Curated annotation (Swiss-Prot):
It is found in: Membrane. It comes from Saccharomyces cerevisiae (strain ATCC 204508 / S288c). It is a multi-pass membrane protein. It comes from the Eukaryota. One of its GO terms (molecular function) is water channel activity. Keywords: Membrane, Transmembrane, Transmembrane helix. The chain crosses the membrane at residues 6-26, 39-59, 66-86, 111-131. Belongs to the MIP/aquaporin (TC 1.A.8) family. Residues 1-5, 60-65, 132-152 are cytoplasmic. GO terms for cellular component: plasma membrane. PANTHER family: AQUAPORIN TRANSPORTER, MIP17260P. Pfam families: MIP. This is Putative uncharacterized protein YLL053C. Residues 27-38, 87-110 are extracellular.
Length: 152
């Protein structure tokens, strides 16, 4: 799945570059005052929140959630709002690579945009597994049942 996504990221970067005049401005770069370690952790936590949202809304199949795209989109929007000024918001290695290829600009810290999403995905999966072990659905279902009893 990685290879097609990377090709698509480069194609999207090239298409966006072709459609916008002048220099490519959508590359990922650390903002002023943002160190590599800060950028690494910000990207990791932004990706973790996004991945945990996907796991809890789209992957968790205990009940159907036809509105899963809404919280996922809101999570991505919030990651962009929080991170763009600091890191340019990668949260996806293919997106970061596509923009870098289109701009022909690979900063010495480009590795952050590859390592952070992997660490963030692992962190989200770990939290999700912990919630599975703690059987969080027992509490969620008890709250839903209590809410239904109040309505009756």
């Amino acid at each position: 799945m990685w290879f097609p996504q990377i090709i698509a990221g480069m194609a999207a970067g090239g298409a966006a570059s072709a459609m916008t005049p002048g220099k490519v401005l959508f590359t990922n770069a650390l903002g002023l005052g943002c160190s590599r370690s800060r950028g690494l952790f910000l990207e990791m936590f932004g990706t973790a929140v996004l991945c945990l949202t996907v796991l809890m809304t789209a992957v968790e199949k205990r009940e159907t959630n036809f509105m899963a795209a809404l919280p996922i989109g809101i999570s991505l929007f919030m990651a962009h709002m929080a991170l763009t000024g600091y890191t340019g918001t990668g949260v996806n290695p293919a997106r970061s690579l596509g923009a870098a290829v289109a701009a022909r600009y690979f900063p010495h810290y480009h590795w952050i945009y590859w390592i952070s999403p992997l660490l963030g995905a692992f962190l989200a999966w770990s939290v999700w597994q912990l919630l599975q072990i703690l059987d969080y659905t027992t509490y969620v279902n008890a709250e839903k049942a209590a809410g239904q009893k109040k309505e009756d």
